[in-house]
Amino acid sequence: MQPKVLHTLEFDKVKEQLAEHASSPLGLEKIDALMPSSDLEEVAAWLDETDEAAAVLRLAGYVPLDGVVDIRPHLKRAAIGGTLSPQELLEVAATSAASRQMKRLIAGLYDEHGGLERLFRYADTLAEAPELEHDVRRSIDDHGEVLDAASDRLRSLRGQIRSVEARIREKLESIIRSPSAQKRLSDAIITIRNDRYVIPVKQEYRGAYGGIVHDQSASGATLFIEPQAVVELNNALREARAKEKQEIERILRELSAKVAEQAEPLARTVEALAALDFAFAKAKYARRLQAAKPAVNSRGYLRFLQARHPLLDQEKAVPNDIELGGDYTTIVITGPNTGGKTVTLKTIGLLTLMAQAGLFIPAADGSEAAVFRSVFADIGDEQSIEQSLSTFSSHMVNIVDILRHVDGESLVLFDELGAGTDPQEGAALAIAILDEVHGRGARTVATTHYPELKAYGYNRPGVVNASVEFDTETLRPTYKLLIGIPGRSNAFDISRRLGLDERIIERAKAQVSAESHNVENMIASLERSKKQAEEDEARARAALEEAERLRAEWEQKWEELEEEKAERLAEATQKAADIIRAAEREAERIIQELRRLQKEKQAEVKEHELVEAKQRLAAAMPKVEKRKKAKKAASRHVFQPGDEVKVTSLNQKGYLIEKVSDDEWQVQLGILKMKIHERDLEYIGSAPAKDVTPIATVKGKDAHVSLELDLRGERYEDALIRLEKYLDDAVLAGYARVSIIHGKGTGALRQGVQQFLKQHRAVKSFRFGEANEGGTGVTIVELK
C-alpha cells in the first residue's frame, strides 16, 4: 500500500483512535507499525485474533495489562551486569505480575470455553517469575524507596542512623532552647546544609558555638553553623549513611542479577505482551465503534452492510449498504458536488484498509471485505467552485500513476473524475479512464457531477449508477447512497427554496433540452420508487423482527415449561422410589413371615394364604396409571381362558384360568392363583395348547419349583426378570440353595446375574460352580 493512499483515506487517523485503547508502550509500538496486508491468510488470522480478544473482553470484562512497561532496555542492561534502579526493578516486577495474571486469565478461559487458540499461544509463552516479584516487592516500596526489610544489615544501619539523628537533634534542641539562643540565633530552628545538621546563627555571634560554617543567607546576616557539640555526631551520621548507600547498592545489584537470570524468558514475555496489548486494543476499538468482524475473500467482492465512516460520530453517521464485485465491478456516483459523494467514497476505501489491517469495521454482521493487492485513490480535499489548471494537472499526475500500476487485484477510487477542465472534454476523459480501469478488471468507485456519465452506467455491462440522496427541504445531502439511481441536478429546487423568482426559474427550464428534462423527471421518479421500496422493506423487516422476538419469547416459555416438567418428573420419580422401597420392605416381611410359618408350623401353607400374601404384596406396590392408549388397546381385546396376559400393577406375566365375574379373572401367576380386575390385564398372546391346571397347595419344597434356573439364550433384561421371580418362588418353596445356569459366553449375562444377586435381600452368598457343577457357567446361590 502506498503511504500517500493511507494518508488520503485517513488511515493514520484511525490508528490515532486505535492508540487510545493501548495499555502500554508495547501496544503503541505495534499500532504505530500497523499496515494493511494483501495476504488473505494473514488478514484472516489478524481478524481471528481481534475476534478472540473481543471474546475475552465479553467473558472477563477486563484484561490485566495496566502494569505492563517496555522493560527491554532494563533486561539488556541487567544481562551485561548493570545495576537497575529501584524504579526499573519495580517496572520489571509489575510487568512480570501482569504477565502472570494475563496467562492465568487466558488459560482459564481457554480451558472453560475453548476457541482462543491464537491468544493461548501468546499466553503460553508468557514467563512467570513469582520469586523475582516477591524479592523486589519485599525490598522496594511503591515510591521506589528501598525498605528496611531488604536485608538485616540495612535494617541495622538505619537503626543506627535514626539513633544518631536523635542524639544530634537532642543536642541542637538544647542549644536553641537555651536563654542565650534568642539573641544569638536568627531563628530557633534546626536545618540541614551539605547533609549535616546546622542552626542559623547571626553574623555577629559566629564564634558563640564554635564548629563549622556551611552556608550563609543571601544578605550575609545569617550563618548556618554546625556547632562543635555535634560535629562528631554528624561525622558518625555521614559514615552510617555511606554504609547505608553501599548496602542499598549491594541489594540493587543482587536484585539486578536475579533479573539477568530471567532476561531471556522475560524478553519473550515482552514480545507476547506487546501482541496481546495490540489485540485487545483492536477489540476495545471495535467495541467503541460497535464494529463487526467482516468475512474476507480474494475474489474482489465486498459487501458492507449499514456501513459508517469510522471517523464520524457513530450516533449521527448515516449507515449505507454498499456492494461491489458481484453483478457490477464499477460504481459511478453522479450528482451535484455537495460533499456527500466524497464521504461515501472514503468510507469504502477506509473500511477496506481497516479490514486488511485486521480491524473490525463499523458495519453490520454479515459484511464481507475483499483483500486487494493495491488500493489507489485520487481524492481532492478542496471542493471549490473554481478549479485551476494546476489542480487538474495534479489529479492527472495521480491518475497516470494509478493507470501505470492498476490490475485485477486493485481497488480504485476516483473523486470528481475529469473535473477542473472543459466539461465536455473532462467527461470524455472520465469515460475513457473508467473504460481502461474497468477493462483491467479492477474494482472501481468514481464520483462525478458530469451528466454525461449518467448514461455510462446504463451502456456498460458490469457498471452501475448511484447517487447520494439530497434533501431539497433542508438543502443538505442525507448521505444515503442510492444504488441504481443516477444523481440529478437540484439547482431549480434549491433556487426556488432560496427565493429565486419563479419566472426566472421557468425561463431557465426552457433553456434545458426536452431530453435532459425527461431524464431528470425519470430520475426523480426512480428516487421516489426506491424510497417507497425502502419504506416497504423497513416495515417488512420490523414485522420479521417482531416475529423473531415472539418466537424467541415462546421458545423461552417452552424451555421453562420443560424445566418445570423435568422438576415435577424428578419429584414423582423420587416419590415412586420411596413407594417401591416401602413395597420391597413389605415383600421381605411377607416372605419372612411365610418362611417362619413353614418352619414353626411344619404344616402346609394353603393356597388362600399365599394368595392373601401376594395380594398384600400387590397392595404395597405403587399404582401407576397406564396411558389411555394402552387401556383402549387392552379393552378392545376379548379375553379368553388360556390367554397369556401381563398384570400391569404387578409387572408379572401369567395365564387366564377362568372369568369369575363381569370384570374379574382368575389368573395363574407362577405358583400363585389370583383374582385380577380386567382393567389391570394386558393381553400378550394366546396360550399354548396345554391344560392349565391350578395348583392347590404348596408343600415344603414344591415339586413345581426347580432347583436350577437355566438363563442361557435369554435377553439380558428378560433374564433378570426371570431370575427375580425364580428367587421369590425358591424362597417361598423353602430352598436353601439353588443353581443359576447362565453359561460362559461373553460374560455379560454372568456379570449381570451376580450383580443382581449382590443386591437381593434373600441371597446369603453365591459362588461359581465347581468343575462337576458346571464351572464358571453356573452360579451356586445360598439363600437365607
Curated annotation (Swiss-Prot):
SUPFAM superfamilies: DNA repair protein MutS, domain III, P-loop containing nucleoside triphosphate hydrolases, SMR domain-like. It is an enzyme of class 3 (hydrolase). Residues 709-784 form the Smr domain. Its EC number is 3.1.-.-, 3.6.4.-. SMART domains: MUTSac, MUTSd, SMR. One of its GO terms (biological process) is negative regulation of DNA recombination. Keywords: ATP-binding, DNA-binding, Endonuclease, Hydrolase, Nuclease, Nucleotide-binding, RNA-binding, rRNA-binding. ATP binds at G335, P336, N337, T338, G339, G340, K341, T342. Pfam families: MSSS, MutS_V, Smr. GO terms for molecular function: ATP binding; ATP hydrolysis activity; ATP-dependent DNA damage sensor activity; endonuclease activity; mismatched DNA binding; ribosomal large subunit binding; rRNA binding. It comes from the Bacteria. Belongs to the DNA mismatch repair MutS family. MutS2 subfamily. Endonuclease that is involved in the suppression of homologous recombination and thus may have a key role in the control of bacterial genetic diversity. Homodimer. Binds to stalled ribosomes, contacting rRNA. This is Endonuclease MutS2. It comes from Geobacillus kaustophilus (strain HTA426).
